Amino acid sequence: MSSQPNKNLKVFDNPNIERNFIIQINMPEFTCLCPKTGQPDFATLYLEYIADKVCIELKSLKMYIWSYRSKGEFHEAVTNKILDDLIQISNPRFMRLKAIFNVRGGIYTTIIAEYQQKNWTFKTKIDLQYQG
């Protein structure tokens, strides 16, 4: 198995497909580069999702996240790109990605992007606030 950063996301079968359960993943070491200055940008990513048929395999997610270390991306673009890639590989019932970027020039940036399958609704009110 490779320990090199790569974009090869993997999934496994949802062990409880009949149930809506929330998966929360905290990624405190996200790094990309500012496309204007080339300086590193650091963020904590909070992923929350309700799987449908498959779940995202964590080691592949780690390698995928690491692959952004040398990429120049705006905060808004990289957050939405990551969400798009995760949706494409897993087709979740619901997914939210929150990216909290460290201060840069006295400004903090938080980007929240989310997705919900068509015709799928929460059966009960669910507060998807990460409790990490």
Swiss-Prot record:
Its EC number is 1.7.1.13. InterPro entries: GTP-CH-I_C/QueF, NADPH_dep_7-cyano-7-deazaG_red, QueF, QueF_type1. The keyword Oxidoreductase applies. It holds the Pfam family QueF. Signal peptide: none annotated. One of its GO terms (cellular component) is cytoplasm. It is an enzyme of class 1 (oxidoreductase). It catalyses: 7-aminomethyl-7-carbaguanine + 2 NADP(+) = 7-cyano-7-deazaguanine + 2 NADPH + 3 H(+). It is found in: Cytoplasm. The active site is at C34 (thioimide intermediate), D41 (proton donor). NCBIfam families: QueF-II (TIGR03139). Catalyzes the NADPH-dependent reduction of 7-cyano-7-deazaguanine (preQ0) to 7-aminomethyl-7-deazaguanine (preQ1). This is NADPH-dependent 7-cyano-7-deazaguanine reductase. It comes from Vesicomyosocius okutanii subsp. Calyptogena okutanii (strain HA). The lineage of its organism: Bacteria, Pseudomonadati, Pseudomonadota, Gammaproteobacteria, Candidatus Pseudothioglobaceae.
